[in-house]
Amino acid sequence: MDRKTFEALVRNTIRELPREFRTKLKNVAIIVEDYPSQELRQRMGIPPEDTLFGLYEGVPLTDRGFFEAPVQPDRILIFQKAIEDECDSPEEVKEEVKITLVHEIAHFFGMDDDYLIDIGY
């Protein structure tokens, strides 16, 4: 899938989210990259054999003070080639993009991995 098509898939997935979630994402940059960089993998302690589809970088809403303004916009990175490498069809890519985006957006809202696993994400 070319980058333009993949980015459109990401945008459409975000549009399908409930409005109350979308409005809170206004200061969150959603960035598509091919793969996580080696520097990012090292910083996160991710072994080379592990696959990373997405990453939330920022301060979760639950950890922010009332008067605290973010220094930089939060970011959600979506790794296109990593997702495509693991999927066998465009339908699987679409489903994995949805799962990954919801997972990373949940981190923005303050949910941790254990909770997300418990609810199926």
Describe the residue ranges of each PLM region.
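Active-site rim/adjacent substrate-binding subdomains
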Residues: 1-96, 108, 115-117
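Short alpha-helical catalytic segment bearing the HExxH-like zincin motif
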Residues: 96-104
